[in-house]
């Protein structure tokens, strides 16, 4: 019976800055299956200096999105129905580790662990107001991918961020990781990662200021990304 041994199930409230770290992990780690990436599953926002502050790639699951329409009511779905939705965006399901990401997983963490006991579960945490403010900073209601229609308005967005964060705090032992190697190892992945030129081949839009970084600068950048927020990891 399938138990999710090749899954990394990820959640975080809107504005928790999860997308950039997830995207970076998928680029540096050779084991990650990125066959859910298409030119349509993209959102990017840059600040006035050209720095990327919104970096959404690959499938997101949840109501009003292309996959996981009923994931706000995931407790009403069977394991088979959930797994069917997980598989849909991947051109090649049978290879590597699949990252499955949804804000709505925060409402169903114990159920997901029960359904997929061998999956690695990963969460991101930032305080409610900081999440709300950052989400607006990267586009707010103008973000077109993923879709946030379910949250309706600012009042409900703030309310649901609070609920999601509370659920995450109750389920995970949150900590600020010392750097990328600690986090990647705890996620069950190899620290033998891609070089910057290899990443640029996969994603030419990868922030070009790092193209000529020396190894120590590259590692410092990765450390900063993986240690900037509290995260929780539950391995199988």
Name each model-derived stretch.
Residues 1-6, 156-236:
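PAPS-dependent sulfotransferases, especially Golgi type II membrane carbohydrate sulfotransferases
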Residues 1-85, 194-220, 236:
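PAPS-dependent sulfotransferase catalytic core
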Residues 84-92:
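Short, well-structured alpha-helical segments in soluble
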Residues 93-192:
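PAPS-dependent sulfotransferase catalytic domain
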């Amino acid at each position: 019976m399938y138990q999710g041994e090749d899954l990394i199930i990820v959640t975080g409230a809107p504005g928790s800055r999860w997308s950039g770290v997830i995207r970076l992990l998928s680029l540096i780690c050779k084991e990650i299956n990125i066959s859910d990436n298409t030119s349509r599953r993209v959102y990017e926002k840059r600040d006035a200096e050209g720095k990327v502050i919104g970096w959404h790639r690959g499938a997101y699951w949840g109501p009003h999105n292309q996959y996981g329409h009923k994931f706000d009511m995931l407790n009403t779905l069977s394991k088979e129905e959930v797994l069917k939705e997980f598989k849909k965006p991947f051109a090649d399901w049978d290879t590597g580790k699949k990252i499955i990401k949804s804000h709505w997983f925060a409402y169903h963490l114990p159920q997901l662990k029960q359904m997929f006991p061998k999956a690695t579960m990963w969460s991101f945490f930032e305080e409610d107001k900081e999440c709300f403010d950052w989400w607006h900073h990267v586009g707010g209601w103008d973000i077109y991918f993923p879709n946030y229609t379910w949250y309706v308005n600012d009042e409900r967005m703030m309310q649901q961020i609070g609920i999601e964060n509370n659920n995450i705090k109750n389920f995970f032992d949150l900590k600020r990781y010392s750097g990328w190697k600690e986090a990647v190892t705890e996620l069950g992945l190899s620290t033998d990662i891609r070089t910057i030129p290899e990443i640029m081949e996969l994603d030419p839009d990868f922030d070009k200021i790092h193209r000529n970084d020396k190894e120590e600068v590259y590692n410092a950048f990765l450390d900063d990304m993986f240690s900037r927020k509290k995260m929780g990891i539950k391995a199988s």
